[in-house]
């Protein structure tokens, strides 16, 4: 429905989540001097890593403010080490199946975190690689990246003229009042 009525490119890929698609597009805008402006409308902290690109901004609709991150690379490393319970990515001290088996993660204290920045056991390094694959949006497999970029370049957005009728039909008064911002 959105794809047919809103004048924006709408992408989906059967083997990629939305955050992967956004990560691929943000990275793609760095190529060939494009640097198209990218605005991510989401409060999801996973996107902080993309703020390393000067043309990428993130706005949190829930907080009604732009998300800032002074050190996106450091944030990414911290996210890899500490994991992300919301996305069921365990910290690097914990086993792969910790959430599936309903066990508690090994507690990641500040001291353990600092130690993991410089030294890791073989298991911790394996878990670091596991988490990097799951968390780092630049690690999307190349064939999926290629598909996403191809879709991005070929998809044709709906004509602008369809938007007003769609918003009226859906009774989106606030959006109708702001239609010039589309």
What are these language model-derived features?
Residues 1-177:
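Extended two-metal-dependent nuclease catalytic cores across DNA- and RNA-processing enzymes
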Residues 180-182:
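Short, amphipathic C-terminal "tail helix"
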